[in-house]
A protein has these predicted regions:
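Short, flexible helix/strand-to-coil boundary loops that buttress conserved ligand/catalytic motifs
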Residues: 13, 48, 78
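Zn2+-dependent cytidine deaminase-like catalytic core
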Residues: 1-44, 128, 154
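Hydrophobic, well-ordered secondary-structure segments
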Residues: 25, 41-48, 90-97
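Proteins enriched for Cys/Gly/acidic motifs involved in redox and nucleic-acid/cofactor modification
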Residues: 39-67
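Short acidic loop-to-helix transition motifs that present clustered carboxylates
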Residues: 17-20, 42-46, 110-112, 137-139
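Short low-complexity, flexible loop/linker segments enriched in glycine and/or proline
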Residues: 24-27, 50-54, 119-120
Length: 170
């Protein structure tokens, strides 16, 4: 900015990182650059909410997505849980998968739905797939295992047979 001779800069939100907070703005002002802060501040805070939460609390940003029927069930009367929601909700699911670094499911979801847990939005990056499976019940034939070489997948378990552990590592 200084090298290019830019005379006016707009800053939507200040960086809360204590290592840099406000220092860049001050350097620009010290060199005669007019700096206006707070332009579209709410939008900028929303855009950077994941980073801001981590940098100020050192805690991860966690979002939960849950689908249920009008009567509070997570599956239809027939037991089908794949299509409890409509098309818009499924699109939003893929937006969330694009936005967040990881997706966590329990072994029950894997056994019931055999999900891919990938992002189907153009140019979307697949989230790391994390499965909580305390007894290592994950089927070697499921979509998550079949595609684990292409999409990072973590299976968290407390116990399980050594043969299955080896097979999953391959």
């Amino acid at each position: 900015i200084l090298e290019r001779g830019i005379g006016k800069v707009y800053v939507g939100s200040m960086d809360p990182n204590p290592k840099v907070a406000g220092k860049g703005v001050q350097i620009l002002r010290d060199h005669g650059v007019e700096v206006q802060t707070g332009l579209l501040e709410e939008e900028c805070l929303s855009l950077n909410e994941i980073f801001f939460r981590y940098i100020t609390t050192k805690m991860p940003y966690v979002a939960m997505k849950y689908a249920m029927t009008l009567d509070g069930k997570i599956a239809s009367f027939s037991g089908d849980s794949k299509w409890v929601t409509g098309e818009k909700a499924r699109e939003h699911t893929h937006f969330l998968r694009k936005k967040y670094r990881g997706i966590l499911v329990g072994i029950g979801t894997v056994l019931a739905d055999d999900p891919m847990l990938n992002c189907r939005i153009e140019n979307g990056v697949d989230p790391v797939r994390i499965v909580c499976d305390s007894h290592l019940q994950i089927p070697l034939e499921c979509q998550l295992v079949k595609t684990a070489k292409d999409i990072e997948t973590i299976v968290c378990y407390a116990e399980g047979n050594e043969e299955k552990q080896k097979a999953l590592m391959e």
